[in-house]
């Protein structure tokens, strides 16, 4: 209790101290008058009573009637309007309590203004002249319809549509009984349409009724109930979009019945099989491109899909118009593509041709992909190259293309069949005759069998000189390959540069006479003709003519090489490689050069032939005896033709022998060139005569002539030389199976050509 009193006394003392501190001038000039008014500093007079506030722990002036009167006088609420500067702690509370009535005072006036606007909206409306697009038409026929009225008024402008119902804003007025009164209202989209209708439609007649057009004026007739008025469309964006749609330049829909969208899609079946894409997935792109090119002929393609997993091989093509799809169906239905007859039909709009991949198929595909990733880089490259080659083989332009209808394709097949039947008998006859001629020429001479037995085997299987392996004519294969590597290149170059046969013959003769080896030039010619022309009929004719020229040079070069070897020894190595003694001495040198040549198999045989001379002579004798018996049967058939050609060739041989003798005496090279050129011209003239006689079988006769010349030259060579054993020794037993194999291969090729 005592503590409370002390606290109260301390507060009182503090308040007195503050009052003394700020209230020193109470007795001075600022002292208020006896009326108790506060001084200029706003301090209360000394006679103001105070009371203790227990809650706030402070002294406050005691509120009495005098205090309230003074407070009101200070804040302008007195009757006389006098203001005072008295302030108090309760001023703020009193002011906030008095302010709300002041703010609420103007509310009744605002409410009245708002009420007035609403009343204005509920009344009649007025349309401005500039925005009035309505036209009132009177004098219409009583039997007119809404559609006819719309058609009439649309000639002068675009009629506005209702944004909610999307119907034209036109109206035909009716009387109480529901009959048309003969007047109507039309609302245009633009103001310019109103002026146009007034100018053109006014005073016009329809079915004898004269029309009158004016701008619509809206007047209130009777009582107007605003509650029944339709609500305004506040969706201005929808209204604006509809107006823009009416103002654009898109053509109107056709009056006829519109076709469905799914009629634009064409479904094509039996285009492929899903198994076709497993080996080469790129075939899918080729088929898609072929289909796009073909379907673009019928119209604009919007979308093209291939359902590669569908077992029926389905493809869908979407066109812009249904008419284009109809044209595509009419054209493609029943046609052939890639060996399959396809079907084309319109899509029903519901069938889904997409085939989803099963879980098992997905696992297999992922397993194959994982195996591909784990495979080494080399195998990947091989697979890529195989896929590329496969795609090239199955290109769209070669393997797959659209063919005509079945009737047309059958007619084409018949025409091609008749063409093949017409050509095949000619080819068979030519091939048969050339084969028979080759066999006959091989049996013309018995003495030549020992020397050219491997050559005959090759010629039996290869009368047309189509393969390099089956055309070794002599036993000197090693020396031939060596000479070819040294001097074969100029011969080839001369033949390729000059398209004429005579220039080729001269170049070949000159080379053969310089080197003293005709056999080498024959092999070169065989290889060159095979590389340049290939296994065709033209190459057969060229080879036969060239070989006949080479035999002439062969006869001369063989005799000259044997004689020059006796005189000069080892001085003319390159010119006398056809001789026997030089081959014995230079076996090792030839083997090294043979490794660089193209025919490595026959070159190895040449080295073995030198070592087995005696054994090979006996075996060649036996082989030649067997062949003589077989070839005697063919000798009689073409005896007449071969005799005539042999006479011509003997005359050529004599001229060549004279050229050889001149070469031994001096300036052998220059004279040999001149003689060979002269003889070659004679041979060319003789061949032109033969070509004129037998144009159809020119190829066969050239082959027969070739074989006769070779046999006669070899026969004469053996007559002049006593070294048959040595020459025959160059063809070893190992050449027999090789030649037989090559002849088998070539005979199979001939069969293929016949087919």
From Swiss-Prot:
Phosphorylation at Ser-748 by CK2 during S-phase in response to DNA damage promotes interaction with TOPBP1 and double-strand break (DSB) repair via homologous recombination. Residues 90-122, 462-476, 508-538, 553-563, 580-590, 652-674, 714-725 have a biased composition (Basic and acidic residues). Residues 259-353 are annotated as: U2AF homology motif (UHM). The modification N6-acetyllysine is found at residue 297. Residues 1-53, 81-122, 380-415, 433-755 are annotated as: Disordered. The keyword Ion transport does not apply. InterPro entries: Nucleotide-bd_a/b_plait_sf, RBD_domain_sf, RRM_dom, TatSF1-like, TatSF1-like_RRM1. Residues 405-415 have a biased composition (Polar residues). Widely expressed. Belongs to the HTATSF1 family. GO terms for biological process: double-strand break repair via homologous recombination; mRNA splicing, via spliceosome; protein localization to site of double-strand break; U2-type prespliceosome assembly. Component of the 17S U2 SnRNP complex, a ribonucleoprotein complex that contains small nuclear RNA (snRNA) U2 and a number of specific proteins. Within the 17S U2 SnRNP complex, interacts (via UHM region) directly with SF3B1. Component of a complex which is at least composed of HTATSF1/Tat-SF1, the P-TEFb complex components CDK9 and CCNT1, RNA polymerase II, SUPT5H, and NCL/nucleolin. Interacts with GTF2F2/RAP30 and POLR2A. Interacts with TCERG1/CA150. Interacts with (poly-ADP-ribosylated) RPA1; promoting HTATSF1 recruitment to DNA damage sites. Residues 381-755 are annotated as: Mediates interaction with the P-TEFb complex. Keywords: Acetylation, Activator, Chromosome, DNA damage, DNA repair, Isopeptide bond, mRNA processing, mRNA splicing, Nucleus, Phosphoprotein, Repeat, RNA-binding, Spliceosome, Transcription, Transcription regulation, Ubl conjugation. Residues 133-218, 264-349 form the RRM domain. It is found in: Nucleus; Chromosome. The modification Phosphothreonine is found at residue 633. GO terms for cellular component: nucleoplasm; nucleus; site of double-strand break; spliceosomal complex; U2 snRNP; U2-type spliceosomal complex. One of its GO terms (molecular function) is chromatin-protein adaptor activity. This is 17S U2 SnRNP complex component HTATSF1. The RRM domains mediate interaction with U snRNPs. The RRM domains specifically bind poly-ADP-ribosylated RPA1. The modification N-acetylserine is found at residue 2.
């Amino acid at each position: 209790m005592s503590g409370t009193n002390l606290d109260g006394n301390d507060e009182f003392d503090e308040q007195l101290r503050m009052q003394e501190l700020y209230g020193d001038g109470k007795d001075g000039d600022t002292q208020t008058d006896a009326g108790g008014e506060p001084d200029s500093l706003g301090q209360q007079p000394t006679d103001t009573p105070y009371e203790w506030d227990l809650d706030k722990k402070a002294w406050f002036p005691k509120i009495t009637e005098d205090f309230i009167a003074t407070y009101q006088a200070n804040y302008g609420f007195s009757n006389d309007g006098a203001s005072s500067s008295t302030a108090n702690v309760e001023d703020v509370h009193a002011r906030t309590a008095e302010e709300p009535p002041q703010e609420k005072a103007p509310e009744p006036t605002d409410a009245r203004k708002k009420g007035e606007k609403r009343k204005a909206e509920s009344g009649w409306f007025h349309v401005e002249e500039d925005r009035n697009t309505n036209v009132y038409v009177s004098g219409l026929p009583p039997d007119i319809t809404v559609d006819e009225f719309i058609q009439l008024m649309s000639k002068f402008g675009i009629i506005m549509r209702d944004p909610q119902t999307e119907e034209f804003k036109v109206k035909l007025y009716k009387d109480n009984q529901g009959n048309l009164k003969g007047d109507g209202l039309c609302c245009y989209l633009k103001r310019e349409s109103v002026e146009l209708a007034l100018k053109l439609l006014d005073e016009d007649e329809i079915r004898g009724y004269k029309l009158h057009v004016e701008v619509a004026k809206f007047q209130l007739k009777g009582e107007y109930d605003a509650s029944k008025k339709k609500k305004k469309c506040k969706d201005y964006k929808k209204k604006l979009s509809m107006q823009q749609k009416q103002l654009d330049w898109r053509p109107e829909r056709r009056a006829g019945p519109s076709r469905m969208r799914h009629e634009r899609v064409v479904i094509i079946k039996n285009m492929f099989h899903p198994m076709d894409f497993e080996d080469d997935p790129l075939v899918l792109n080729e088929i898609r491109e072929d289909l796009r090119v073909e379907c673009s002929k019928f119209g604009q393609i919007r979308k093209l899909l291939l359902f590669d997993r569908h077992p029926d091989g389905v493809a869908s093509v979407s066109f812009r118009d249904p008419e284009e799809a109809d044209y595509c169906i009419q054209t493609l239905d029943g046609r052939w593509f890639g060996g399959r007859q396809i079907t084309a039909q319109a899509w029903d709009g519901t069938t889904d041709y997409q085939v989803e991949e099963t879980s098992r198929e997905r696992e297999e595909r992922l397993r194959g992909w994982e195996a591909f990733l784990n495979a080494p880089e080399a195998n990947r490259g091989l697979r890529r190259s195989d896929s590329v080659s496969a795609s090239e083989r199955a290109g769209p332009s070669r393997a797959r293309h659209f063919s005509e209808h079945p009737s047309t394709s059958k007619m084409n097949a018949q025409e091609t069949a008749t063409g093949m039947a017409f050509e095949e008998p000619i080819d068979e006859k030519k091939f048969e005759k050339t084969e028979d001629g080759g066999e006959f020429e091989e049996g013309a001479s018995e003495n030549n069998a020992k020397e050219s037995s491997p050559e005959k085997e090759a010629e039996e299987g290869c009368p047309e000189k189509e393969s390099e392996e089956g055309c070794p004519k002599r036993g000197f294969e090693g020396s031939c390959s060596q000479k070819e590597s040294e001097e074969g290149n100029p011969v080839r170059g001369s033949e390729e540069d000059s398209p004429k046969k005579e220039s080729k013959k001269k170049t070949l003769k000159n080379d053969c006479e310089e080197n003293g080896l005709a056999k080498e030039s024959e092999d070169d010619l065989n290889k060159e003709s095979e590389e340049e022309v290939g296994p065709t009929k033209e190459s057969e004719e060229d080879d036969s003519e060239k070989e006949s020229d080479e035999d002439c040079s062969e006869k001369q070069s063989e005799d000259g090489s044997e004689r020059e070897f006796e005189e000069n020894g080892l001085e003319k190595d390159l010119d006398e490689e056809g001789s026997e003694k030089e081959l014995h001495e230079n076996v090792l040198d030839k083997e090294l050069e043979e490794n660089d040549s193209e025919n490595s198999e026959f070159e190895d045989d040449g080295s073995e032939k030198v070592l087995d001379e005696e054994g090979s002579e006996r075996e060649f004798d036996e082989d030649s005896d067997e062949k003589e018996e077989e070839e005697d049967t063919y000798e009689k058939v073409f005896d007449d033709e071969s005799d005539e050609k042999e006479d011509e060739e003997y005359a050529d041989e004599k001229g060549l022998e004279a050229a050889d003798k001149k070469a031994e005496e001096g300036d052998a090279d220059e004279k040999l060139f001149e003689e060979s050129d002269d003889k070659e011209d004679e041979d060319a003239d003789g061949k032109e005569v033969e070509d004129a006689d037998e144009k159809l079988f020119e190829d066969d006769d050239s082959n027969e002539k070739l074989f006769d010349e070779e046999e006669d030259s070899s026969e004469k060579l053996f007559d002049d030389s006593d070294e048959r054993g040595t020459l025959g020794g160059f063809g070893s037993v190992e050449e027999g199976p090789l030649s037989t194999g090559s002849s088998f291969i070539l005979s199979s090729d001939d069969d293929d050509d016949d087919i």
